[in-house]
Amino acid sequence: MLLSIFTSLLVPKLLGVESYGYWQLFIFYSSYVGLFHFGLCDGVYLREGGCPRDKLDKRKVNSIFWCGIVYQLVFVVIATTFLLSNKNSSDRVIVLLSTAVVLIISNAYSFFGYLFQAINETRIFSYSVIIDRVSYIIPVLGLIIARNANFAYYILSYIFARSIALLFCIVKGWDILTSGFISIRQTLRETFDCIRVGCKLLFATLASMLILGVARFAIDSRWGIETFGKVSFALSLVTFIMQFLMQVSMVLFPALRQANSSERKKAYISISGILDTISPFVYVMYFPVMFVISSWLPQYKESMLYFALLLPICVFDGKMDMCCTTFFKVLRQEKKLLCINVMTLIISSVLTFISAWVFGSLYCVLIGMVSAVFLRNLFSEYMLNKDFEVKFSLTHFVCVLMSGLFILFAYLFETIIAFSLYIGALVVYAYFQRTSLCKLSTGVKRIMVGDKD
């Protein structure tokens, strides 16, 4: 995460606003390449979750992997042929062709990543993520030192890093790749079964991404690549925190799959309560980040107002990923998750259309994004609360209130005044939540002492 922050502060410093916009457009498109494995990775993750490596049917998994590579290669060849015959701007063609290349590499990498997490070898996946980040930052630092402002080279660095991470996963999964194959008929049947199981989760994930994605597509179309770049910069700051929470949720899944119903209920209540309690403190980080960005990247000062409006996404989407989505997967309620995400996507699309093409307001688009994410979290918690027979806590509503106060203060007042007002509100909040905070602090201390022992 620190490496991501480091590069995200350096790259926009060197690239112009337009070039940075194309770089962010590539990152944006690349985030959707997972659609084209059609749920294969998700299916393997769900079917093999909790199964140790020594009990894994390696020949079956190997056959499924190569079957997935073949049908994705066919799609990439068709897409590349179409792109080369089309008359788009050269910069957009570079972005789209690079995305086609990343599709194969990233989906192969994702297959191993999901598999390692499913068989409870999360450490290997974590190492691959570190290798990916380090392999990216080394060439990027070289480009920055050379003051190379061509976004295409940064895309090449991304592809290189993802390839190195894939190579690491191949080495760690070599026993699987050399285990042999099952028959073609069995391979097709097993692949189809994985897609059938995983497609609901895939489309739920896709709908989840499009809740924010439709707004980003609209911003690119309505306001152009420079505004898209500025909004994407603000979203990239939000994404740093989200990436950390997603890694935590991946670790929770295998453990919760093996827990009984009462243990799952206790875990749900605990995780939900902890996230509600600590979430208001997340907003404090806005003020030092605002100061640093305004000084280091004055051309992105406008992005910080966008960041203030978008920061609640960390709270609501973070809770969704770490708590709600994890428990929907554990309870095998992918269909329910899909319905919630599709319903929220429709709301997001309507809000985006009205904001962008009726009101013509970028700020309304951003507020619509946050509103959609909040509603998704609310719907999900309502469903899970019914399943576990628990009620919404008062802390949940206070968390929503603190989010509203933060946006109000950041939008209406100068930074120093907004900071003072929010700290005052946070002190009042901490006073009324002192019992919960003390329990949380005691729990953290016990964990730290236990680690030392």
Regions found by a protein language model. Give the residues of each.
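Hydrophobic alpha-helical transmembrane segments
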Residues: 127-176, 342-353, 361-383, 420-432
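Signature of the first transmembrane helix
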Residues: 1-39, 102, 199-220, 225, ...
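Alpha-helical transmembrane segments of multi-pass membrane proteins
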Residues: 31, 73-74, 88-112, 164, ...
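Interhelical loop/hinge segments that connect adjacent transmembrane helices in multipass membrane
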Residues: 151-158, 167-212, 251, 255-265, ...
